[in-house]
């Protein structure tokens, strides 16, 4: 146990794993359960005292006066259209961006490519690495054919040195890789701790607002998928991006979860190749290109990610369970939502899944959070259990309630247009789905899940797998 510090009655202790703050030291964090992760939180200054305040307490501008003085928001675009989309249309000056992702997922590769694109566009770009030497970054740039681009490289972990460099160079864009390696001599804790991460993020964000430099901070994520360090860092910055993907899958998803200058929940799709990350401008066609011959348990969901319509394949497998407690396994969707759909199918439609293992997968490594996927999940589960092949020209969307009703969802026109563009002819959707003029697509409306199940079993031109031969 650490020794008590005299004269510090207001000391706090924080967890290095989750950022939870307590008033006293403990061996185990009560929030996340990790051991030996509590340390004293030597925070930043609490601000000036009343006696030290100046005569001027702040400058205020009337809101109506901003019309004449405020300039339109200027954005700088790069040739990576997927990145521009996620940023809300381009890079905004004086913005602070936090990019998180698993180790080895491709964060540094993406940002090095982006830095090269912005440098070619005329932005003075500085890439500071706290994890690699400048020569190592140079080798990585050479592998990506970026070694001739006008990027300035640096390698340092001391916050004072980094701020001095930024003050001297005054770049348009500075990339700090990563925030967990930066340490400040004003904070008495090890690099990567909650106090150090918060202090570094505060100083760098303040510099961005004061100087007009756009700052990109790279952050590691915890095993729960959250950016490591205190959540206050996400509140400091303007934009929070997550770089997602599976190690064995070539696709990567750049997802915006916060953006003060654009739409949140926007995604950009990239493919990892030997020459770095290549953008995927039509992800729906790419995700469905490997679908192959339709099989039982497979159907297509017409979804929306941010402002982008996206068609993905939902795959389900239902088999007898050899265990006393059947298994429910989900990849790419919410497991609690799957449990709810199974319960509604049993209670409202009399389709029993007890004694059966259920597996659900979103093809392509995507993570779907939309409740509009409920109907597609129900269709794939019924198809898998009843051994029915759904015709390949069908797409599905709709939210399922606990009563079994199928509720309407948003952005229906975008879903229908994307489905028709990729050759789909029929849509199973909720009631009150407005037809879009000029679209050659047939819409089948569904009031509740029971009528949908009956239609799927009897009236959708089903093909039993035993009759395929």
What is the role of each PLM region?
Residues 5-17, 21-87, 92-100, 105-112, ...:
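Peripheral, non-AAA+ core regions of ATP-driven protein-machinery
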Residues 125-129:
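Conserved RecA-like ASCE P-loop NTPase motor core of nucleic-acid helicases/translocases
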Residues 130-136:
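Conserved Walker A/P-loop ATP-binding site and its immediately adjacent core
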């Amino acid at each position: 146990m650490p020794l008590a510090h005299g004269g510090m009655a207001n000391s706090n202790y924080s967890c290095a794993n989750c950022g939870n703050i307590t008033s006293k030291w403990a061996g185990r964090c009560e929030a996340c359960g990790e051991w030996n992760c509590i340390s004293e939180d030597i925070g930043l200054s609490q601000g000036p005292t009343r006696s030290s305040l100046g005569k001027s307490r702040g400058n205020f501008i009337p809101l109506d006066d901003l019309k004449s003085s405020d300039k339109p928001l200027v954005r700088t675009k790069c040739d990576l259209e997927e990145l521009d989309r996620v940023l809300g249309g381009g890079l905004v000056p004086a913005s602070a961006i936090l990019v998180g992702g698993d180790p080895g997922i491709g964060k540094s590769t993406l940002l090095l490519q982006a830095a090269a694109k912005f440098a070619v566009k005329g932005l003075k770009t500085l890439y500071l690495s706290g994890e690699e030497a400048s020569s190592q970054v140079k080798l990585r740039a050479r592998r990506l054919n970026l070694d001739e681009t006008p990027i300035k490289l640096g390698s340092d972990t001391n916050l004072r040195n980094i701020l001095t460099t930024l003050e001297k160079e005054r770049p348009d864009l500075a990339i700090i890789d990563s925030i967990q390696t930066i340490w400040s001599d004003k904070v008495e804790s090890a690099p990567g701790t909650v106090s150090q991460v918060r202090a570094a993020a505060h100083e760098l964000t303040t510099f961005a607002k004061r100087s007009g430099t756009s700052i990109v901070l790279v952050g590691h994520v915890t095993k729960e998928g959250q950016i490591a360090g205190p959540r206050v860092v996400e509140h400091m910055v303007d934009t929070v991006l997550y770089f997602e993907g599976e190690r064995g899958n070539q696709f990567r998803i750049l997802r915006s979860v916060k953006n003060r200058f654009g739409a949140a929940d926007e995604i950009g799709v990239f493919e990892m190749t030997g020459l770095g990350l290549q953008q995927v401008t039509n992800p729906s066609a790419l995700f469905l290109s490997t679908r192959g011959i339709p099989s039982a348990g497979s159907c297509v969901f017409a979804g929306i990610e941010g402002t982008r319509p996206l068609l993905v394949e939902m795959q389900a497998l239902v088999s007898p369970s050899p265990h006393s407690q059947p298994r429910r396994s989900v990849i790419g969707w919410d497991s609690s939502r799957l449990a709810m759909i199974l319960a509604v199918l049993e209670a409202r439609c009399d389709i029993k899944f007890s004694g059966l293992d259920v597996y659900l997968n979103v093809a392509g490594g995507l993570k779907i959070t939309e409740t509009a996927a409920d109907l597609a999940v129900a269709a794939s589960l019924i198809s898998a259990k009843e051994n029915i092949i759904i015709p390949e020209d069908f797409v599905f969307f709709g939210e399922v309630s606990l009563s079994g009703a199928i509720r309407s969802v948003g952005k229906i026109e975008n879903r229908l247009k994307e489905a028709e563009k990729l050759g789909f002819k029929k849509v199973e959707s909720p009631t009150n789905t407005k037809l879009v003029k000029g679209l050659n697509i047939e819409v089948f409306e569904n009031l509740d899940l029971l009528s949908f199940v009956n239609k799927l079993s009897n009236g959708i031109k089903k093909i039993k797998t035993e009759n395929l031969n």
